[in-house]
Amino acid sequence: MAVVDDLAPGMDSSPPSEDYGRQPPQDLAAEQSVLGGMLLSKDAIADVLERLRPGDFYRPAHQNVYDAILDLYGRGEPADAVTVAAELDRRGLLRRIGGAPYLHTLISTVPTAANAGYYASIVAEKALLRRLVEAGTRVVQYGYAGAEGADVAEVVDRAQAEIYDVADRRLSEDFVALEDLLQPTMDEIDAIASSGGLARGVATGFTELDEVTNGLHPGQMVIVAARPGVGKSTLGLDFMRSCSIRHRMASVIFSLEMSKSEIVMRLLSAEAKIKLSDMRSGRMSDDDWTRLARRMSEISEAPLFIDDSPNLTMMEIRAKARRLRQKANLKLIVVDYLQLMTSGKKYESRQVEVSEFSRHLKLLAKELEVPVVAISQLNRGPEQRTDKKPMLADLRESGCLTASTRILRADTGAEVAFGELMRSGERPMVWSLDERLRMVARPMINVFPSGRKEVFRLRLASGREVEATGSHPFMKFEGWTPLAQLKVGDRIAAPRRVPEPIDTQRMPESELISLARMIGDGSCLKNQPIRYEPVDEANLAAVTVSAAHSDRAAIRDDYLAARVPSLRPARQRLPRGRCTPIAAWLAGLGLFTKRSHEKCVPEAVFRAPNDQVALFLRHLWSAGGSVRWDPTNGQGRVYYGSTSRRLIDDVAQLLLRVGIFSWITHAPKLGGHDSWRLHIHGAKDQVRFLRHVGVHGAEAVAAQEMLRQLKGPVRNPNLDSAPKKVWAQVRNRLSAKQMMDIQLHEPTMWKHSPSRSRPHRAEARIEDRAIHELARGDAYWDTVVEITSIGDQHVFDGTVSGTHNFVANGISLHNSLEQDADVVILLHRPDAFDRDDPRGGEADFILAKHRNGPTKTVTVAHQLHLSRFANMAR
């Protein structure tokens, strides 16, 4: 057992002087001798193939020859000058390497085929030096990037990774063909079967747990979670005792909670079976001392390492783990515990920081090819249940959403339901808030089910709604906060604007106009005429023109029996069973046969650029919206109505594309379909709508009058405001700098939430990152008005790379911590909550998540007085 030494040994020798223009390290004679030996002897091929890869040869011609020899050898065919020449000729490479005579030159060059393995070592060493030169060049580039403003910690970490890759001789590849993976996988399956199904990974020491997991496997991230005092640190040490003391494989614990001596005491207590309390109080018997001395000599050689450095950062853990991987062939890493780690950086919330740790620990597990056990703390969820059993939802920073929750895509601009992503397996780009509160595109790299949990419906003042578990985090100004901790009146972030999608596709404008009119005032039911029925002559004319441009003739009904003038497609003689072109067009967009309460905006509109989105909204508003000036209240009225909630949500989403935040109200109707209205409040957004979107037809006159009125003083509701805590921060900073002017000094002003214009003015005077982000960011601070339980449902979550959040149902939501884990073990001790529990002395390892196998509850005995858990007698 050892303690990690943080001090790297000094380097006595000075670095070599720079010498530019030199050839990279190589030995062409050794390369020729290797290939010549392989052409002469099959045994030489066997000696060489495990030491070299094609990229280890300096000359490209030698790489081609080596690859051809290995291909022939792998197929069981002879590899000599004749067959290799034929293979290279088949590939069109023979002339490139110098023709068949060069192969005979290789044979004549080799002194003896028996030394091919030695020649291969020379080639491998030169290749390693070349990679070191390449890595050094990249490190120099990273250094210059750091001097130009890149994050220094990230630069150092990338430089370390470059050197580590060279030392570990690992060549990164973008992909591996399936055929290259089949045989190694078959070998692993065969090895598991031949060992009777025993653990192939690092054995945990618990028989039943190993039977389910087959041990802890390289590349896995394992979360061990429990409430305080249940024994999660003890379980982590049990894993290490099994790895290092029982099986003599190296392990390391990075402890942010216990000191080195405390950890060693616990290990000795568990191994010598001496009460930890007796050790600490000095009440050990002679028999205890004898057992302790005997076990100390037995475990002193165990390759177990301990690091209790305070304020340990992720970069330090990576650097130390890489060094141990080289020094001691590290097989297991334990981090105790996740919530105590620090990054040294400023994050908008602790939840984001912990999620970053989780992701980096998973990447560390994959990089070093070792299992990483991250100990984590559960929230108070178990204490609120009758049986006190923990659930996956209790994991801190964990949360879930229902299958119907719609995620905003960045590639198409449309929304897609979680359930659809699960069915299709698609992993799209999504819009996400970065640390500056700006919308950025980030990949959703994983979507997964999280079981059945209690779900709450959260409704905002703007009418937006989302269904989530109590543990799902929402963004407050103070940071990411679980839904269970939110209350009515809290302010959370929603997008105030959304950029154009990454892959925009323009639509024919005639089709766009026709589509907007059909959604707003059209009827396209099966076995009924397809009609458009406005009362505005200008709108009728617009549809007539757009239909003509789309090669769709339209005729007008204007007879007395008709309730209103209408346009319908001209009758055409079609074969039986064929629908009209306009019906086929609407069916292709998913709108044919849709009733008014079922309508929605097709994906093609969301893909369109912003100028076409504005055109679509202009004609849609003319068909189903209203724009007017209210002289009684001295303010404008801009709204759109529909019996389809989905259509209202889609229109709200499109308005964000042109930088307009809207509000949704609900009007229940007995005996019919409820209706919804989408309102645009505030002079600023109304002016933006009138200038950038506008309306068509008779409403255009009212729009011009409204725009004229809005240029003067009008009532302007303070809807787009910042949380009060921001206002307090602004006031404190201004007071400290003695910069309060008359506009920012009135006492009554501090009683209310500030409009965004005031922090914007303050931001110009004080240097405060939070105020800057608030004034310039893309977050709208909406108000929680209702939180209601809607029962248990199947729920899902996703992983967003980098920013760890996404837009769902028009609200910014965080993703979960558990998504990075391959295995989640929840620890439960019934007697931790009730000392008289009949199961006293027992503990449950609840395998709540197992990416590569079944879940199960494993019952063990807890002997915490001896700092250990133990298998139950079978």
From Swiss-Prot:
> Residue limits of the SF4 helicase domain?
195-462, 612-874
The way its activity is modulated is described as: In vitro 5'-3' helicase activity is stimulated by single-stranded binding protein (SSB, Rv0054) at low concentrations (0.02 to 0.16 uM), decreases at intermediate concentrations (0.32 to 0.64 uM), and is inhibited at higher concentrations.
Pfam families the record matches: DnaB (PF00772), DnaB_C (PF03796), Intein_splicing (PF14890), LAGLIDADG_3 (PF14528)
> EC number(s) on record?
5.6.2.3, 3.1.-.-
Question: Membrane-crossing residues?
Answer: none
Task: Domain (DOD-type homing endonuclease): give its ranges.
Answer: 582-660
What's the family? Belongs to the helicase family. DnaB subfamily.
Region (Disordered): which ranges? 1-25
One cellular component term (GO) for this entry is: peptidoglycan-based cell wall
What remark about domains does the record contain? Residues 135-197 are required for dimerization of a 1-197 fragment.
- Can you state the subunit structure given in the record? Homohexamer. Interacts with single-stranded binding protein (SSB, Rv0054). Co-immunoprecipitates with DarG in the presence and absence of darT.
Q: How is it modified after translation?
A: This protein undergoes a protein self splicing that involves a post-translational excision of the intervening region (intein) followed by peptide ligation.
Q: Which reaction does it catalyse?
A: Couples ATP hydrolysis with the unwinding of duplex DNA at the replication fork by translocating in the 5'-3' direction. This creates two antiparallel DNA single strands (ssDNA). The leading ssDNA polymer is the template for DNA polymerase III holoenzyme which synthesizes a continuous strand; ATP + H2O = ADP + phosphate + H(+)
Gene Ontology biological-process entries: DNA damage response; DNA replication; DNA replication, synthesis of primer; intein-mediated protein splicing; intron homing
Which domain of life does this protein belong to? Bacteria
Which amino acids does the record list as binding ATP? 226-233
Query: What protein does this entry describe?
Result: Replicative DNA helicase DnaB
Any miscellaneous information on file?
Was identified as a high-confidence drug target.
Q: What induces it?
A: Part of the dnaB-darT-darG operon.
Variant or mutagenesis effect after changing residue 227 to C: Loss of DNA helicase activity
Q: Which Gene Ontology MF annotations are present?
A: ATP binding; ATP hydrolysis activity; DNA binding; DNA helicase activity; endonuclease activity
